[in-house]
Structure formats: C-alpha cells, structure tokens
Amino acid sequence: QSFSNFLPNLMWRKKFTAKSSIRVFYRGSTDFPSINQLQDVVGQSNPLRISSGNPFLKQSYTNFLATRYTFTNSQTGQSFFANIFLRSASNYISNAIYIASADSSIQQGIVLKANSQLTKPINLDGYKSLSSFFTYSIPVKFIKTNINLNAGFSYSRLPGQTNYVNIITDNKVYNGGVVFASNISEYVDFNLSYNASFNNTNTTALNATNTNYVNQSTGLQINLLDKKGWFVQNNITNQAYSGLSAGNNQSFWLWNAAIGKKILKNQAGELKLSVFDLLKQNQSIARVVDANTITDSQTKVLQQYFLLTFTYNLKNFGVAKQQAKNDEEHHGMRGGGPGF
C-alpha cells in the first residue's frame, strides 16, 4: 500500500496581561499500520488465542488540539495552570475478536478450536479522547509552606468489534490531590502529599459488567541536614487499590531512605548510602483498558537494594577558570619575562 497525507500545524497565543496568557495548538498526525499488522499471516503460538494480520488495513488519521492557560503572580507567589487535550481519529486501528462456537477452518490446514479466539486488526471510526489537568499553588508564609492543589479528568472512547458486532468502551478517570511543600530552613524541609483517582469503565460488549476502581497514594518526604554536612533523607509512600479483580486489591508501603555527608572544600563532594524499599513491599499493579478487554495485572518488580554513591559538584569550575585567566592578565601587566 501507499499513503499520502496533509498534516497541518497551527498555533495561536495571546497574552492577556503580564501575569496570564493562553496558547492553543493544533496538529494533524497519522498512525501507520505495522508490518506485522499488514501481513496476512496467522500466528499460532497460543492455540487458544490465534492472531492474524490484515493486508487491507489503512492508516489512522488523528486530530490533536491542546490548550494551555497560565497565570503567575510573582509578588504573591500564586500560580494557576490549566491544560486541556483533545484527540479524535478516523480509521482508528483497533482489533476485531472472533470467538468460535465450534471448530472452524480459518485457512487451509488451520483450525480455530471451539471457544478459542481469533484477533485481527481492523479500521474503525469513533475514537475520541479528552484529558485535562489543573493546578493551583499558593504560599502560606507563617509555616513557610507552598500548598499545591491539583485536579484532572480524562475520558477515552475506544471502538472495537467482537463476533462482527461493533462495541464501544468508555473509560473515565477523575483525579485530585494536594501537596504541602515546605522549606522551613536551610537544614530542614518536608513534603506531604495525597492523591486519589477514581476510574470508571463502561462497555457495550455483551454480558460485560461495568467496573470501577480507586487508587490512593499518600506520601511523606523529610530531609534533614546539619551544619557539619551530615544529612538524612526519608521518602515514605503508601499505595492503596480497591475495586480491582481478586488478588489486586492491596495496600503497601514503599520506604526509601538515605544517609550521607557532604565533604571536601565548600562541600563540593557528597558520599551517600541509600536503601530502596526498606520494607520489601514494593509492587506494580495496573489496569489496562482497550476496546475489547479490561485487564488487571500485578508484575514482579525489584525490591530492596542498597546503593553507595559519590557525587562531586563542578559548579565552581567556571569561576576557577576565570580566576586563572585574571591571574594571567595580572602577571602580563606587570611585564614579567623577556620581551622582543
């Protein structure tokens, strides 16, 4: 196949005041089918889940629109940011799933057993998505803390097909959180945060149930430093999941810690011993939603390990180089050495 495209890019920006502005951006893009998707070859590595390519697959065309509004008041320290992203696609590359009710021949010598499924990429219209994120920040001077409030919403409309019947899966995510970020002094700072997301998935697939799940994250970071250069760092996070499939509704703690000392002249060097996942509870839990399936997964991840690091800060390198140049010029002005 051959493809041709017209891919426009447009941007509009307006500055309302010295503190606020808005930018709108549009871009057209394409998503080409892969070689594997175009090849009319049947994959039989898993007899229960056979896959096939589609040589008639077309490219997908996506319209993308982004809007960003910013407000910053440097005098009061307040700021507000709003981001909204919209996408729509024609000829969206999705998957068609056929579940055999009886043994079926799909190619010469290839039989799809009863209750097995055949997956094949197809083009479908109707894909849409929206995502947004809003954040507001304000300083609270009497406790030397910045408070950041954030909220967001995302939506995706995913077209698919099962047994020649078109289906639509709608996925909505609502999230919000708050962060208290403090820098009490040169020697003490902390960060306290809470975030929650509520996920709702609806599908028109036959016999499918609508699902909801909640993910909550609470975190605390504390950094302590003394005048002699010794420091202690702690980062503690709790992750809690509810509403997922059996075995994935869990709550666990992730604690990373470090101790070290700043050394050498002007404390340019740092020697630090870190331990990751002190409690050996780290996990990776996720839900993946596509046009035809909703999958909860739990993946093994690297748990507790230790790391010893040495860091040297070169921030004064340019100053030393300039000082050497000044010394050369100074000696030259004194007329040292033989002349011509």
Description of each model-found segment:
Residues Q1-F340:
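Exposed, low-structure sequence patches enriched in small/polar residues
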